Amino acid sequence: EIKILTYKQNNIHDFAWFADKRFIVNYDTCKLASGKVIDVFTYYTTPQKEVWKSSLLYAKDAIQHYSSLVGEYPYNVVSVVQGPASFGGGMEYPTITVLSPEKSSRSLNFTIAHEIGHNWFYGILGTNERKYAWMDEGMNSFYESKYQQRQNDHFGQRTEQSLLETFIVEKKDQPIGTSSEDFNEPNYGLIAYYKASKWMTLLEKQLGTAVFNKAMQEYYRQWQFKHPQ
């Protein structure tokens, strides 16, 4: 017997679909400040059950975090999927993200936040990831760092700061506006993610949090479902 499933989603520029008969499926709803309610799903396998036991909470926290600071999540569903160990990292798509297995719930929490954040920075604000990597990875990492700060955690940031300072001294640093293919190894991760995030932090301090938030929310309002560059 053939089973046909049909999926439709407006206002997206990318698509992915995942299936595994072994998936444990968790479901809850998330209520945003406006009163809008969205469906939240997480999918994982038995070996990751302990690490993923709070995955719904992490996903809901991330959706509310980005919605409150940048702009309301426009879709009706968000899903987080555990991929195979060979996958290596996380990959974002509109309304859904896939992650490789994590060693701890702490790292899973922040990986979920980062990948869900890409719904805003790459998904809704459809920048050119390869030409302007900082506009999705840098901006997204900035808001992920705020997510960490809310939980009094600075996961990995001290190491990145030390690396950046070393690269600057050794003159191996590159501008945040460098295109992806022109980054030296390991500058893509260090510059496009971390350095761009620190630049956003300095900009917020210069403008003041209220003005900065208003500017970013206006950017979101004007450019959602478009391709800023």
Mark where each language-model region is.
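Secondary-structure capping and boundary motifs in well-ordered enzyme cores
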Residues: 91, 104-113, 132-135, 139, ...
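Metalloprotease/metallohydrolase-associated module, dominated by Zn2+-dependent proteases
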Residues: 64, 169-197
